[in-house]
Amino acid sequence: MKKAFVKSYGCQMNAYDAARMADVLGAEGYTATDTVEDADVVVLNTCHIREKAAEKVYSELGRLRVLKGERKAQGLDTRIVVAGCVAQAEGAEIQARQPAVDVVVGPQSYHRLPDLLARSRERRVVDTEFPVEDKFDHLPRRRTLGASAFLTVQEGCDKFCAFCVVPYTRGAEVSRSVAAVLAEAEKLADGGVREITLIGQNVNAYHGDGPDGAPAGLADLVRAVAKIPGIARIRYTTSHPNDFDDALIRAHAEVPALMPYLHLPVQSGSDRILAAMNRKHTGDAYRRLIDRIRAARPDIALSSDFIVGFPGETDADFAETLRLVRDVGFESAFSFKYSTRPGTPAADRTDQVPEAVMAARLAELQALLDSQRHAYQRAAAGRVFDVLVEKRGRHPGQVAGKTPHLLAVQFDAAPHHIGQVVPVRITEAGSNSLFGELVSEAAAA
């Protein structure tokens, strides 16, 4: 029996794409394996957002080249596939640097994977075109489902932030129709999924065709998905502040299934740096938007992205970022040193910030963000949350799940609770997750 190993790097959309590639291969008779040494096909679904992520791929390819040679000596064939955004950006270079790679396929073409694998037996293949056909129309039914699932509703980005490669690797903004999204969501619900996360590079720019042919916004889509029987929870990511409209804010107040958690990247607190990044908003505009969202949903938990050391960033600029973090308060956040990406406007700037300065600023920012995260987790102790149980826990007799605010919880319970939403009292806050105890409905009330 043929086996496939799929490894994904980076964002939630990459996780979705990796799962769909596994489905495509499954429809061709491949079974999934967690052991790369056993795989007849190895797929690396790559991320190009930072240099470090791309170099990880090349390091992994070096190991796979050795593995491919060892399997060949045993009479076993191994096909190596590089997919995702590194593939899109560096297709020919990948094969030049690593001849062991058989297929390079971009994020819009992976529905062609079976054909590409067949062609690769004659010669190595690169497919990084943006095809006319919609890849979603060619994807098979999902084969493996859990309690929660990602669902791509929008791809690409038209914002062209000065540091970002996404518009070049994922293309212009494209939205799936409401009907197409609902059809996939209904299949997920039929398969036992209780929570759907609607994903896109700029998901709140969603403008898919609605039932009447007119463009629908993300708020319209959220309300439609919320009507599907069995779907108890809805989330969405990732958003841009400039596309956050009143309808979406109202949805947070009016749609019970829309969870009180929002990932809304700001990148910097300095207006000067935000302008240089081409973000087209200010720090105060972000603060005002957060105030409006919190007025609609006071218990909402916030997450964000931050870049330190963008070219030209001064100590005063960085201080503005720290001030914004203190003003807003975040449950969690992702923070990184600026990474030069070839082909982006920021890469050509001559005022790059020294590595040591970036490292010091990142450490200071992460210490502040960690203190906010730990305070948020400590405040959860003693409270009861509805937890969606997703899987078995770290230890025997435990299960693990997420609160509405996306906090991870471990607690003792039987595995038959997986897929259920149950009340859990938080008893302890750990460094990365909460611990709790299952309580009765009466006690929760």
From Swiss-Prot:
Family annotation (HAMAP family): tRNA_metthiotr_MiaB (MF_01864)
Compartments, as annotated in UniProt: Cytoplasm
MTTase N-terminal domain location: 2-122
Gene encoding the protein: miaB
EC numbers for this chain: 2.8.4.3
Main location: cytoplasm
Domain of life where this protein originates: Bacteria
Entry protein name: tRNA-2-methylthio-N(6)-dimethylallyladenosine synthase
